[in-house]
Amino acid sequence: MKLSVDWLNEFTPLSQIPFEKVLEKINTSICEIDDVEEFKSHLSSVITVKIKSLEKHPNAEKLQTTIATDGSKEYQIVTAATNVAVGDIVPLALPGTKLDGKEILDSELRGVRSQGMYCSEKELGMALESSGVLILPKDTTLGISVRKYFLWEDTILTIDNKSITHRPDLWNHFGFARELASQLQIPLHHFPLQADTKWESGNQGLTVEKSEHAHAYYVCSIQNVNITESIPKIKSRLEKCGIRSINNVVDVSNYLLLELGQPTHFFDRSKLQSTSFTVSKSKEGESISLLDDTSPTLPNHILLIQNGETPVALAGVMGGKDSAVSESTKEIVMESAVFKREDVRYTIRKTNIRTESAVRYEKGLDSYTCLPVMKRAVQLLKENGNPNVKVFEPQGFNHTESKTVTIETNLSFLRHKLGKKISLHEVTDILQRLGFEVTTKDESLSVLVPKYRQNYDVTIPEDLVEEIGRTIGYASIRTEALSMAVETPIRNPLRELERRVKQFLALEVGFNEVYNYSFASPTDAKLEKEFEVTSLKIANEMPEEHSLLRNSLYPGLIKQTKVNQDRFEKVNLFELGRTYHKEGNDATLAQEKRWISLLSLSKCKPTDLSSIEDEFLTVRETISELFLFLNLPKFEWVKLPRTHFHPNASLVLLYDGKEVVELGILHTRFADLYDLKRRAILSKIDMEVLVQIWETYGRNSHFVPPSHFPQGQLDLSLIMNESDPTESFANLVKTLRIPELESVFVQTIFQGESVGEGKKSVTYRFILMSYDKTFTQDRFKELSDRLVETAKSNGYSLR
């Protein structure tokens, strides 16, 4: 947002305060300033001169030689302009001036000295194109800067919008001046909302139907309108704030927006089809032609202004083209309204149209200004080329006219929250300067919030603390050490466990942690079929891809993988996060579950099933190592199908009979849905179940000294059906309770012609360890024979 210091001075005497102090107070007590600049400072050396003589250039047919005077000094200027004549007053850029990035020089043009350059509107930044030198009125004072002539001598403050998004009262010059006056303790001496305007009796047939879709809505009829240019003051102020002048009626609407922050709109009455107005909502497929020459097709529930049955404006956003003010306009209808900020935000989001009016409405305006702004508009219309307008009584409604906000608090609360001892007199003085009405009894305060601050801004005692704190300056609050006792924090087992799991995944096995939004699309919600019915829709209107709270961490990991699959051969990701589920029809809160989910993207082609199975087993081994890292060795892998996994690659890890982990290869239909080019291996760990198991079995580590004897290993290759789970034989061996057996795992899996169609060769590796003696060849043979016998007796054949 841009603010004119000259305009602010109209309301409060900022010129009496050192400018550096004003800037400091804004930054420390009100908002951040992005930039401070002198408006069109590069034109300071462009002055007004009068052409005294004009002759043909002796050496160039298309050039002319002129003598111009600023009243005290003469300049010889060579020009190619054909629209200048003796006696014309024109702008002259003196040597050293920079226009369009080029410096004007005292130079010779075809042998004749030229001491500057006459300027067009384009070169002064007043128009995109111009056909010749700008000719100024005959009564223009000579020798003055064009900055002074066009009222451009001003300093412009660019305010960071984010820092005042909660302060709609500051989105205008009067509101900002009012705030500055209170902070700098200087008076306000101009009150535009107190304009003295008399209405003509009657309403000229206009009617407004009451509507629940607006806080307030008024219209009035204005006759004897003359369309012309705006006066210099209004044109220059609009330009300094980045708004192009249109005409003396439309400019008043824009001027009011910048002066008071209250949007208004003017309709050409001759173009209206009816005398009745109402605020309603659109129907699917309805269309309206807007001032920006677009005709959007509207969805349901867009807020509209209806004239009879015809939509004439997107309420709070933009007016319609068919009822716009034009050069032939003689009678207008003025609109002043306050719409619900939720409705305006919905319109912005659905139409992607954001205007200065919409920005202010979406912050939440109070309706008390609607009628005073109409009076101020009439005053400006009369000043701006329409002294004879007749304005008839406004028609409309105001649903929130009597709204008040009173906050009860006490001095001890304010002192405690501020961290500073402050007197009751000081508190009262600060709040009253800021426009609050304060009633005190002993140390209790009853504070009536001013109307321009009561909408979504100051509503609770903590807001008063902020008002006092920023006014006295946060730097004045002394820094003190914490006065509370330093105690050992309460142990949080879940946080401890999460830290250990993240340490293992990130540091031990090289997975990368990611963070994803907690929002999901309807498509994402269908990935884990068991959770689809528990999906929660976000109450606030959101784009479809973010319309639900996530019920699974998998979609976020898959989307991250999709982005990175062409950049990296190896993609191993994990995320620690919450999912949200509907607990029941009567539940008021969502059920939150905490998970760690993993994704490992295969490095192989989707058709290389043997290599993919090896990678799947590697991930399974990684999770097994995690449980050993957590001192939880007594786990069991069991085949259990999941709809989102491949039917032959879906496992769960059980511990003490409880399901803790699921692991599988993402089903091809989901891989295709998310455009994954390679197979993805997914897993998730239920952290709530895991922490219970870890607290019960894993926290107390027991040191087992290493054996003094070397370990041995046996490999056994078996032929089995392609669909047989590899863990079946491993689990069978564990039931033999061989005392020397430390672990068993799958070393390799092979498929090919040599093992037969529909078959696979699986090589198991058995790690053997004795703690009291060295293995002998006889014991190795005995164990090997026992394993072979077990395999054969259970239907497996040796390879």
From Swiss-Prot:
Q: Which residues form the tRNA-binding domain?
A: 40-147
- Keywords on record: Aminoacyl-tRNA synthetase, ATP-binding, Cytoplasm, Ligase, Magnesium, Metal-binding, Nucleotide-binding, Protein biosynthesis, RNA-binding, tRNA-binding
| Lyase among keywords | no
Location of the B5 domain: 402-479
Under the heading Gene3D superfamilies, the entry gives: 3.30.56.10, Bira Bifunctional Protein, Domain 2 (3.30.930.10), Ferrodoxin-fold anticodon-binding domain (3.30.70.380), Nucleic acid-binding proteins (2.40.50.140), Phenylalanyl-trna Synthetase, Chain B, domain 3 (3.50.40.10)
Q: Where does Mg(2+) bind?
A: 457, 463, 466-467
Cell compartments where the protein resides: Cytoplasm
Q: What is its main location?
A: cytoplasm
**Catalytic function, reaction form:** tRNA(Phe) + L-phenylalanine + ATP = L-phenylalanyl-tRNA(Phe) + AMP + diphosphate + H(+)
| Domain of life according to the entry | Bacteria
Q: How is the cofactor bound?
A: Binds 2 magnesium ions per tetramer.
Q: Name one Pfam family in it.
A: tRNA_synthFbeta
| Keyword Metal-binding set for record | yes
Domain FDX-ACB, chain residue ranges per copy: 707-799
Q: Which GO terms describe its biological process?
A: phenylalanyl-tRNA aminoacylation
Q: Mind naming one GO cellular-component term on file for this protein?
A: phenylalanine-tRNA ligase complex
- Database matches in CDD domains: tRNA_bind_bactPheRS
Q: Which GO terms describe its molecular function?
A: ATP binding; magnesium ion binding; phenylalanine-tRNA ligase activity; tRNA binding
> Do you know which HAMAP family this protein is assigned to?
Phe_tRNA_synth_beta1
Give the record's subunit note. Answer: Tetramer of two alpha and two beta subunits.
Protein name per its UniProtKB record: Phenylalanine--tRNA ligase beta subunit
Organism encoding this protein? Leptospira biflexa serovar Patoc (strain Patoc 1 / ATCC 23582 / Paris)
Q: Gene name on record?
A: pheT
